[in-house]
Amino acid sequence: MLSLPRLWTHTGPLTLLLLPVAWFFASLVTVRRLAFRRGWLTRVDVGIPVIVVGNITAGGSGKTPLVIWLTNWLREQGHRPGVVSRGYGGKARRCVELGAESTAAEVGDEPLLIHRKTGAPVVVGRDRPAAARVLRARHPEVDIIVSDDGLQHYRLGRALELAVLDAATGFGNGWPLPAGPLREPFRRLHEVDGVVQVVRGGGAWRTYLGLKTWRADYRAGDARRLRAPEERKPLRALAQREWLAATGIGRPEGFFAMLEAHGVRHRPRAFPDHHAFRPDDLPAGGAVLMTEKDAVKCADFAGPDWWAVDLEVVPEAGFVEWLRTRLGS
């Protein structure tokens, strides 16, 4: 069966069948965006600066690692950041603040990973302005908010918009959802404040006419054992054996290519993005490698030889300086 992400890489008969739905979707997006620009619908000002990090394409683009980098960087600059997120894949129906007992099933895998890797307060909720209000009420010390995957949530006022692109996949076949991966038209990128292209495995990045973009390299760090997170090994130290590489992320081929670049022999197994892992999905006694995003859902039933690979993005110096100037820090 042809999966949607694969469908989005080319234009075929099924693409053409979906075009009427895609045009209808694109029209709704355009009208809604226009309503906010003209003031027919109003944005909510939460009283402190909001940085929105998102993308105009569906699927993985490296957005979550950039949110983690940005949140940690803001703290290094003397800010006290907090994060709001939709909590995709979680069951929470109201605004929920993440804590030590939070699970991916409740709040979503990406917010849980952000919280654990930054230590920043994180609130998830379908209503972004409401989530931001809860965050401010519970953490009055927060002086700046990072909105995870919030580019299309126009109701939340924002001081800065950052769009993230995957340099390898770009805009796919260029069609709107569901015929293609576009949540919004390409021209939306000319309205945001900055565009970051995430480059995996030292690959090339793309040049788009009239569009200024910065580069951020997607890098693999150490691997850590799920049952004993304090036990860490360089990724190349795992190259002496074959692994089952299992992941439920938007662009699994990027993870597999990264393992290959580090000489790690593996059998790839891709699950749907945000997959809710169960104990019988993977061999309990096998040697398994996964991403950190997957690990937050597997820690409770991990086998003794299951490991998670630290993944991070490192933006180029020019982007960091631009960001520092824009924020006045």
UniProtKB/Swiss-Prot annotation:
Pfam families: LpxK (PF02606). Keywords: ATP-binding, Kinase, Lipid A biosynthesis, Lipid biosynthesis, Lipid metabolism, Nucleotide-binding, Transferase. Its EC number is 2.7.1.130. Pathway: Glycolipid biosynthesis; lipid IV(A) biosynthesis; lipid IV(A) from (3R)-3-hydroxytetradecanoyl-[acyl-carrier-protein] and UDP-N-acetyl-alpha-D-glucosamine: step 6/6. GO terms for cellular component: plasma membrane. It comes from the Bacteria. One of its GO terms (biological process) is lipid A biosynthetic process. It is an enzyme of class 2 (transferase). It catalyses: a lipid A disaccharide + ATP = a lipid IVA + ADP + H(+). ATP binds at T57, A58, G59, G60, S61, G62, K63, T64. GO terms for molecular function: ATP binding; tetraacyldisaccharide 4'-kinase activity. InterPro entries: LpxK, P-loop_NTPase. The keyword Zinc does not apply. The keyword Transferase applies. Transfers the gamma-phosphate of ATP to the 4'-position of a tetraacyldisaccharide 1-phosphate intermediate (termed DS-1-P) to form tetraacyldisaccharide 1,4'-bis-phosphate (lipid IVA). Belongs to the LpxK family. This is Tetraacyldisaccharide 4'-kinase. The gene is lpxK.
